[in-house]
Curated annotation (Swiss-Prot):
This is tRNA (guanine(37)-N(1))-methyltransferase. Belongs to the class I-like SAM-binding methyltransferase superfamily. TRM5/TYW2 family. The lineage of its organism: Eukaryota, Fungi, Dikarya, Ascomycota, Taphrinomycotina. One of its GO terms (biological process) is mitochondrial tRNA methylation. S-adenosyl-L-methionine binds at residues 221, 259-260, 287-288, 344. It comes from Schizosaccharomyces pombe (strain 972 / ATCC 24843). Gene3D superfamilies: Met-10+ protein-like domains (3.30.300.110), Vaccinia Virus protein VP39 (3.40.50.150). InterPro entries: MeTrfase_TRM5/TYW2, SAM-dependent_MTases_sf, TRM5-TYW2-like_MTfase, TRM5/TYW2-like_N, tRNA_Gua_MeTrfase_euk. Its EC number is 2.1.1.228. Keywords: Cytoplasm, Methyltransferase, Mitochondrion, Nucleus, S-adenosyl-L-methionine, Transferase, tRNA processing. Monomer. The gene is trm5. Disulfide bonds: none annotated. The keyword rRNA-binding does not apply. Pfam families: TRM5-TYW2_MTfase, TYW2_N_2. GO terms for cellular component: cytoplasm; mitochondrial matrix; nucleus.
Amino acid sequence: MAELLHPNKVEMKPFLKNLDKNLFKKTYNLVAAKVSPKKVGLLNKVCKKDLLDWPRVKHVYQQNNEKLVLLNRDASLDGTRGLSDATVSFIKENNIELVPFQLTLDYDYWRADDILDAILPPGEKEDHPSGFTAVGHIAHMNLREEWLPYKYIIGKVILDKNPSIETVVNKTDTIDTKFRTFQMEVLAGKDDFIVTQSESNCKFRFDFSKVYWNSRLSTEHDRLIQQFQPGDAVCDVMAGVGPFACPAGKKNVIVFANDLNPYSYESLVENIFLNKVANFVKAFNQDGREFIRSSVQKLLGFSKDEKAITVFPPRKRARKLEENKDPVRQDIPIPPVFSHYVMNLPGSAIEFLDAFKGCYYGLEYLFKDRSLPKVHVHCFCRFPDPEEDLINRIYASLGYRFSPEEVDFYYVRKVAPNKDMYCCTFTLPGSIIFAKPVSG
């Protein structure tokens, strides 16, 4: 069946941008049972095993006042081959006429894999590049060098076969080390990078060509957000366009969200208002190390000035509460210290840990009845023993050597062969954050 339902091989020259869709028409000579509409149901029931059962192909067609029911590929026109005894008997007993039927499958029928298998050079099927990451209306591909001569045709096929996709792009270089953005080329569709992406019950709007976004991290975003409790204060040091900050804000978590990329900051501000979390999420545009140090006083001042954030239940729930004479507002105290620091810049976030040295110097009293903050730092690792490597790197930056039991090493995903992404979670030691800052 796999070989049968496949378009004919098509020779494709490199760097073509358009496909001749007529090349993908394929006609099958089949046999159909001609019956009255009243008998279709009974025939379907009795002859079920002998009917044509191809994916996305209907087996009943109208012809004048009668129905043509397609039989399986092996059925002969005289009914002597390819049919079960039950079907043969049913046809004879009901004087059903068998007629030839030509079924034509065209470009619209075939899936992207089918088309690419037909036009790309011979190779392992799973190697043909039909996979992509969807970001809003954009399909983001990362084509290997061997497929670059066929990149425009590949893009065209992906565009044609995915109705929600309007633009197909290919990454043309490695991620920029400063802002995690990368150069991309439009392979097919419109030249429009402004996307709206849904994730974690939030909407995010941004220019995909100017900011970092990875839809494959949605599970990791949700994992950390679930650890934040209403009324917690979270410092999102490398916040991007807000995938941690905005959903956390919807949970009534106070978030100070920062990103150095001015385009990310601009989108972050927009997304805060788009998701109606401005009371809980504050946006900043600073260097990460500088922000870690300055955010302590920012939150302390915010806590003293505002004291609490008032929230109201949704209107429908508010009406029910009013009927029950329950309060319809809630005051959420603003804590003076952060419960969590999120550092989602896996290429270099560990190097920013030195900024925590002395960040709460002279403020020990704030933690009299509070736990010390947790840090969630994302990082890449290329070593077979990730725990040893990551502990050494944390020590080199923070100046504190954790035991393996003091750090949660969470495996996030494989980024490339011999390159994995982890999230290291640990509690900041008092000996580090309360230490007297070293001048100069």
